């Protein structure tokens, strides 16, 4: 749990995504410096739990890496909007003795690891992609999320796009029925498992890999190129979605087009009330949402390797924010 407070502060409570927590933490600290009269408490409890808390009315707004679809919006107790905040990459990190950054993996190989079909690091399919590495004959210790996770939703969306067996089997979801592996709570939990378990392999948001100095795989994209996750390679995925977002900001950018596009990317969203019940909280929320779309806020996101939203998407987002009615 994280928050900043001051005397007589207007306090907002927010809960959800661990994917967005690193930048949300920085944003909240900076926003409090600019607006000492506003404090924001963010609970990084996972997208599913954040949506549940928003639905129950225990937080002012939620954070999820999966936007609410029309059916979910209809179940909310109050009119609700999806607001974009950042985009980022999900990386496959590993802890294999003697193997540093740059392990090459393809989508079908990643899917088969998570399906339990590839179980050893020296499997011929992994060796074929990495002819210059000496891979050990050790078990792959698969790690995944144990909570309802937007990061898992993005990752399983990718797996379904590259593997018919995954699409027809576990499928896409925040809490899929994982065929193999050990689960942990949140991105920090999975990162911790990978760091401390030799032979481990798992998916986390790029900022967590950076913070924990963990090597990440270079992944084959739709064009057949092996691409490392970065601000630029994530931005290629984001830019490919701009036209689609003019109609609806709820778009997938996994396995996107482009020779240099990193294939496992996604947006993160804030789940907000269209008619905030508390006028003071509503005004503070709207002001904060607008600030996240500023150049300063998006530059801060880039410092943590999230891809800043291009101006065209920020304009679309600001139009949605302007529909929030504070009584």
Regions found by a protein language model. Name each.
Residues 3-327:
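Flexible loop/hinge segments at secondary-structure junctions
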């Amino acid at each position: 749990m994280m928050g900043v407070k001051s005397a007589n502060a207007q306090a907002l409570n927010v809960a959800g995504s661990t994917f967005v927590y690193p930048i949300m933490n920085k944003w909240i600290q900076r926003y409090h410096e600019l607006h000492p009269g506003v404090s924001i408490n963010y609970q990084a409890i996972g997208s599913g739990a954040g949506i549940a808390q928003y639905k129950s009315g225990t937080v002012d707004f939620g954070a999820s890496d999966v936007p609410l679809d029309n059916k979910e919006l209809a179940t909310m107790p109050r009119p609700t909007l999806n607001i974009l905040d950042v985009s980022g990459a999900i990386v496959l990190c590993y802890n294999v003795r003697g193997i540093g950054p740059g392990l090459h993996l393809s989508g079908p190989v990643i899917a088969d690891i998570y399906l339990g079909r590839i179980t050893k690091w020296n499997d011929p399919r992994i060796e074929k992609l990495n002819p210059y590495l000496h891979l050990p004959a050790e078990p792959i210790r698969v790690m995944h999320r144990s909570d309802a996770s937007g990061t898992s939703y993005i990752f399983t969306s990718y797996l379904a796009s590259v593997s018919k067996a995954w699409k027809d089997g576990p499928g896409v979801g925040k809490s899929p029925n994982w065929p193999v592996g050990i689960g942990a709570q949140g991105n920090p939990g999975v990162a911790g498992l990978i760091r401390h378990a030799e032979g481990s392999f798992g998916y986390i948001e790029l900022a967590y890999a950076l913070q924990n100095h963990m090597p990440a795989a270079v992944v084959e994209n739709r064009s057949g190129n092996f691409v490392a996750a970065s601000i630029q390679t994530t931005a290629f995925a984001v830019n490919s979605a701009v036209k689609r977002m003019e109609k609806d900001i709820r778009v997938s950018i996994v396995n996107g087009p482009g020779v240099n596009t990193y294939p496992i990317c996604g947006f993160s969203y804030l789940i907000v009330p269209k008619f905030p019940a508390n006028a003071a909280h509503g005004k503070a929320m709207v002001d904060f949402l607008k600030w996240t779309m500023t150049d300063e806020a998006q530059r801060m996101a880039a410092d943590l390797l999230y891809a800043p939203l291009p101006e065209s998407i920020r304009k679309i987002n600001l139009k949605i924010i302007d529909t929030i009615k504070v009584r």
